[in-house]
C-alpha cells in the first residue's frame, strides 16, 4: 500500500460517523456533488472537515450507538442470568457471573469504607460495560466498518470515503470523559449526602491549608478553593484520558498493521491481540478501582 493511501486509510479509520449542525451558507461536497446550504442544517458529516466544522455540539453516532448497544447487551445478559438463578450450585454462564460478582464485591469491600448500596452495583456495571467496549478492539479493523461502507454505498448512494464507522467506543474521548465526569458528579453527590452542603464547601475551602487564626483562615480560602477545584476536576480528566489513551494506542497498532500488511494483517495482529486481552481487562479494572477509591474518599470523615 502506498504511503499516501496508507495515510488516508489510517485517517479514515480514526474518523467517527458524526451528526451535527452546519451553518447557513456552508458549502459542502457530499455524495458526489456540491451544494450551498440555504439555512442551518442538522445532517451527517460527509468528511472530517465537515465533522470539525460542526463544532462541539456534534454527536458521534457510532460511539453512542455501540456504547448504548453494548450496555443493553450487558443488562440483557445479567437479566437472563438472574432469571435462571437457583439455590443450587451454579454452572456454565451462571458460574461465570457469580465469579465476576464475587470478585467485584471483594474489591468494593477492600476499597470502599463507607456505607452505600450504590457502590457495588455501580462497580459491576462499570467493569462489565468498559470491558465490553474495550473488547470490540479485538474485532478485525475492517470487518464491521467495511460492511457498513458497503451498505451505505449500495443502498444510500454514499461514497466510500464518506462512510466513517468506529466500533470501539472507548477510543472516543467523548465516551470515556462522559463516563468519568459522571463519576465526578457522583463524588459531589455522595459528599453532599454524607457531609451536607456545608461539609462539601468545607472540603474545598478549608483544605489543604488550615489555620487557627480567623484572618489567615479567610485569606487561605481562595487558595484552597483553587487547589481543591483543580484536584476535583483532575480526577475525571485523568480517569477518562487514561482509558482513552491506552485503548486508542491499541487500536492504532491494529490499524497500522492492517494498513501495512493488508490481507496478511492477521499474522501480525494475532500476537498483539493476545497481549491486548490483558490490556482491555486491566483498563476496565483500573477504571473501576479508581472509581471506588474516589467515591470512598468522598465519604471519608476528616
From Swiss-Prot:
The UniProt keywords, alphabetically, are: ATP synthesis, Cell inner membrane, Cell membrane, CF(0), Hydrogen ion transport, Ion transport, Membrane, Transmembrane, Transmembrane helix, Transport
- GO annotation, cellular component aspect: plasma membrane; proton-transporting ATP synthase complex
Any idea which GO molecular function terms this record carries? proton-transporting ATP synthase activity, rotational mechanism
Q: Which residues cross the membrane?
A: 61-81, 119-139, 148-168, 172-192, 214-234, 252-272, 273-293
How does this protein lie in the membrane?
Answer: Multi-pass membrane protein
UniProt-listed PROSITE patterns: ATPASE_A (PS00449)
What Gene3D superfamilies does its record include?
Answer: ATP synthase, F0 complex, subunit A (1.20.120.220)
**Role according to the record:** Key component of the proton channel; it plays a direct role in the translocation of protons across the membrane.
Q: Record's NCBIfam families?
A: ATP_synt_6_or_A, PRK05815.1-1
* Subunit record text: F-type ATPases have 2 components, CF(1) - the catalytic core - and CF(0) - the membrane proton channel. CF(1) has five subunits: alpha(3), beta(3), gamma(1), delta(1), epsilon(1). CF(0) has three main subunits: a(1), b(2) and c(9-12). The alpha and beta chains form an alternating ring which encloses part of the gamma chain. CF(1) is attached to CF(0) by a central stalk formed by the gamma and epsilon chains, while a peripheral stalk is formed by the delta and b chains.
Report the family membership.
Answer: Belongs to the ATPase A chain family.
What is the designated name of this protein? ATP synthase subunit a
Species of the source: Alcanivorax borkumensis (strain ATCC 700651 / DSM 11573 / NCIMB 13689 / SK2)
Name the encoding gene, please.
atpB
Amino acid at each position: 500500500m502506498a504511503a499516501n493511501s496508507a495515510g488516508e486509510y489510517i485517517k479514515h479509520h480514526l474518523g467517527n460517523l458524526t451528526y451535527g449542525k452546519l451553518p447557513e451558507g456552508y458549502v459542502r461536497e457530499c455524495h458526489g456533488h456540491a451544494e450551498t446550504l440555504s439555512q442551518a442544517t442538522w445532517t451527517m458529516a460527509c468528511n472530517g472537515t465537515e465533522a470539525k466544522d460542526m463544532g462541539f455540539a456534534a454527536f458521534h453516532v457510532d460511539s453512542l450507538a455501540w456504547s448504548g448497544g453494548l450496555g443493553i447487551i450487558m443488562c440483557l445478559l445479567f437479566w437472563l442470568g438472574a432469571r435462571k438463578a437457583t439455590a443450587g450450585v451454579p454452572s456454565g454462564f451462571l458460574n461465570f457471573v457469580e465469579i465476576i460478582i464475587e470478585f467485584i464485591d471483594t474489591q468494593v469491600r477492600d476499597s470502599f469504607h463507607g456505607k452505600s448500596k450504590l457502590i457495588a452495583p455501580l462497580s459491576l456495571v462499570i467493569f462489565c460495560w468498559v470491558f465490553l467496549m474495550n473488547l470490540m478492539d479485538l474485532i478485525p479493523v475492517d470487518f464491521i466498518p467495511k460492511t457498513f461502507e458497503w451498505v451505505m454505498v449500495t443502498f444510500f448512494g454514499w461514497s466510500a470515503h464518506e462512510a466513517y464507522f468506529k466500533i470501539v467506543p472507548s477510543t472516543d474521548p467523548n465516551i470515556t470523559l462522559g463516563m468519568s465526569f459522571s463519576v465526578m458528579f457522583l463524588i459531589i453527590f455522595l459528599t453532599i449526602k454524607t457531609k451536607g452542603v456545608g461539609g462539601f464547601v468545607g472540603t474545598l475551602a478549608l483544605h489543604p491549608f488550615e489555620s487557627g487564626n480567623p484572618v489567615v483562615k479567610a485569606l487561605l480560602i481562595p487558595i484552597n478553593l483553587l487547589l481543591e477545584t483543580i484536584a476535583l476536576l483532575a480526577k475525571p480528566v485523568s480517569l477518562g484520558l487514561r482509558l482513552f489513551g491506552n485503548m486508542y494506542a491499541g487500536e492504532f497498532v491494529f490499524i497500522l498493521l492492517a494498513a501495512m500488511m493488508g490481507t496478511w494483517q492477521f499474522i501480525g495482529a494475532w500476537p498483539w491481540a493476545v497481549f491486548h486481552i490483558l490490556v482491555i481487562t486491566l483498563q476496565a479494572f483500573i477504571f473501576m478501582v479508581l472509581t471506588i477509591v474516589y467515591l470512598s474518599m468522598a465519604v471519608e470523615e476528616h
